[in-house]
Curated annotation (Swiss-Prot):
Probable mitochondrial mRNA stabilization factor. The keyword Membrane applies. Residues 1-51 form a transit peptide. This is ATPase synthesis protein 25, mitochondrial. Belongs to the ATP25 family. One of its GO terms (cellular component) is mitochondrial inner membrane. Its main location: mitochondrion. GO terms for biological process: mitochondrial gene expression; mRNA stabilization.
């Protein structure tokens, strides 16, 4: 008989359903019991295989055999054994990532450096995310740099302006929290400082009644792309103490220079390339090492020894691609079998050639042995910029001529113009006068006579000519002659005649060299049309000029050559007018020949020449040859 509690339980529908399922369903206790075991056995294997570089997938048959041998799995059915297999998408071998070909090599920690340098370099690379980290050990500078004694300087490149300020601020807080170092960050803009400054700038512009100074999306010069974090390992404690000399006498008070000054220069890529502080400090350290050796009565054996010492002090970032490019550049350089040390530019360097000798087919310096090399010019400019070599006004003009006119295997106009920009910027920083008449003439002349004259130099030439007109340059006779010669070399006849007309614009008389160059340039073209057009207005102006121009030998020869090109038969008719063949011509033909335009000009020239010879102002050709 069913007891009352059982009957009460059977009266509930849910309890009745549970009892029926327990009695009627198949026993699955073993499968339910083995499920956690299978998961516990398989999941660590799958996890280890997914994150490992080695293939740890076991053969399918071994896993099946292992499951069958297990006592707990003995009563399982065929369906349970098949469900124990690993799915197909888990049997795929995980991808293997190849090792990076360009491993970043962090700078090595110098000897006797503060303990904070090691973790600091690691933090700068991993947490701050700065690239191209370099380290300069400047503790040997004597006297020390203005930044502090025993200087160690690091450089890093930030990805953007925002990255620069955020990472620099975190770096200062990291030093304060982990190493108890109170570092200063010059140029750092705080999180809300930029917004505050821009708001003040907008308010100021609104009060002034103009908003044109506000650039949308810009910082308006508030940020510089450069944050300098610096601190000293000795802290801010400065102990003043009395100083005594070698004899024991009191010499004053002072604080001994102790500790190490650490400077971290964080810059954007553009700012770092613009300043190039590594090259500047490298030149300073090199010069200081040489001077200290010389003061002790010693010197480096050779340049290689000095470079080894510099390499141990300066660790610059290097990559495989950069090293390969440097090797290619070094292999492509020309090696000369003679010394070029005595061929430096000097203030007393003469002009390469007179301005009147540049009308040949090629410039004169191309026919002589190479006097200057473009690499030497570049090195000289770097010495002026980095070391501070003195520079005079004449040396400035010679450097510009050397940068533009020196022959080079790679005639890159862009590189030459960049050199000129650098030397002009250096001269302007030193307070030298650069925008005068001589500078305009030198720049235009050097560009026109450059072996790489092309579109880029033409663009720069047009800009210079525009500035020249705006400034109202008043050139002297020699400068006008140089401009005419340079334009004639490039066969730019419009600008050639424009330069020829410059003296009358400023109420100045032309010199005989101007007319001689004009006649000779036209004669060298062998163009009858150009010679006729030039003679019809140049010759009357020459004859009416006050003071008059004497037909001396160079001018006379050039004018005669130009007349011969304009009228090839004039010279023949003038000297052979009495021949029978010409006498037998009809009167109309004879008058036509006698009244030719340039035949009259040639007769006039010959008569003037004869008068000068009778007056003794000009020697005859026979007398000149005899002398």
């Amino acid at each position: 008989m069913i007891t009352r509690p059982v009957a009460a339980a059977l009266s509930c529908r849910q309890c009745r359903s549970a009892i029926l399922r327990a009695v009627v369903s198949r026993p699955t206790a073993s499968s339910l019991r083995t499920l956690p075991q299978r998961q516990a056995r398989q999941l660590p294997i799958l996890t280890r295989r997914f994150f490992s570089e080695e293939k740890t997938i076991e053969p399918k048959g071994e896993r099946v055999a292992e499951v069958l041998v297990t006592p707990d799995n003995a009563p399982e059915t065929k369906d349970t054994a098949e469900s124990d297999d690993v799915p197909w998408f888990l049997e795929v071998e995980p991808p293997r990532h190849p090792e990076s070909q360009h491993k970043v090599e962090l700078p090595k920690i110098p000897e006797d450096a503060p303990e904070v340098i090691g973790p600091m370099i690691k933090y700068i690379f991993e947490d701050m995310g700065l690239d191209d980290i370099s380290l300069l050990d400047l503790r040997d500078l004597d006297p020390p740099a203005a930044l502090g004694p025993n200087l160690i300087m690091l450089f890093g490149t930030a990805r953007s302006e925002r990255h620069l300020h955020i990472s620099s601020g975190r770096f200062v807080r990291w030093l304060r929290k982990n190493h108890s170092i109170a570092a200063r960050a010059d140029g750092l803009i705080g999180p809300g400082e930029l917004r505050t400054k821009l708001r003040r700038l907008r308010k100021k512009a609104k009060l002034l009644g103009t908003n044109t100074a506000i650039i949308p999306g810009g910082d308006n010069g508030i940020s510089t792309g450069w944050v300098c974090v610096h601190f000293s390992s000795s802290g801010d404690n400065i102990n003043e103490a009395a100083s005594f000399d070698d004899s024991g006498r009191f010499s004053g008070f002072g604080a001994p220079q102790t500790g190490t000054t650490v400077v971290v220069q964080c810059m954007t890529e553009a700012r770092r390339g613009e300043l190039d502080l590594e090259t500047l400090w490298q030149a300073i350290l090199k010069k200081n090492l040489q001077e200290n050796k010389k003061a002790r009565g010693e010197k480096f054996a050779d340049a290689e020894e000095l470079n080894k010492v510099l390499a141990s002090k300066i660790q610059l970032p290097s990559s495989a691609s950069a090293l390969q490019w440097q090797a290619m550049q070094k292999a492509s350089q020309q090696h000369r079998s003679y010394s070029t040390s005595a061929r430096r530019l000097s203030p007393s360097l003469e002009r390469e050639q007179p301005a009147s000798n540049l009308l040949n087919e090629e410039p004169e310096f191309a026919e002589e042995p190479v006097v200057l090399d473009l690499a030497l010019v570049q090195k000289h400019i770097q010495d002026i910029q980095l070391i501070g070599t003195p520079m005079t006004q004449e040396m400035l003009y010679n450097l510009i001529k050397g940068a533009m006119m020196t022959p080079s295997p790679n005639n890159a106009a862009k590189d030459r113009l960049s050199l000129v920009d650098q030397i002009l910027l250096t001269a302007e920083e030193r307070g030298m006068e650069i925008w005068n008449d001589e500078m305009f003439v030198t720049l235009i002349e050097a560009g026109l006579l450059s072996p790489c004259y092309g579109l880029e130099i033409q663009r720069a030439q047009k800009n210079l000519e525009y500035l020249m007109k705006q400034k109202g340059c008043q050139f002297n006779g020699d400068q006008v002659l140089r401009l005419m010669n340079a334009y004639a070399y490039q066969k730019d006849w419009d600008r050639f005649w424009d330069a020829f007309r410059m003296p009358p614009r400023f109420k100045m008389a032309r010199e005989s060299q101007h007319y001689e160059l004009a006649y000779r340039a036209m004669a060298l073209t062998s163009s009858q049309k150009m010679c006729i057009a030039a003679l019809r207005w140049v010759y009357p102006e020459m004859m009416s000029q006050d003071p008059p121009i004497l037909l001396v030998s160079p001018l006379y020869d050039s004018l005669k050559a130009c007349l011969t090109v304009a009228d090839p038969g004039a010279l023949t008719w003038m000297h052979n007018a009495s021949e029978t063949k010409l006498i037998n011509l009809r009167p109309v033909q004879r008058r036509r020949l006698e009244n030719r335009e340039f035949l009259k000009v040639m007769r006039e020239v010959e008569s003037i020449r004869a008068e000068l010879m009778r007056a003794g102002l000009v020697q005859s050709e026979s007398g000149a040859l005899h002398q």
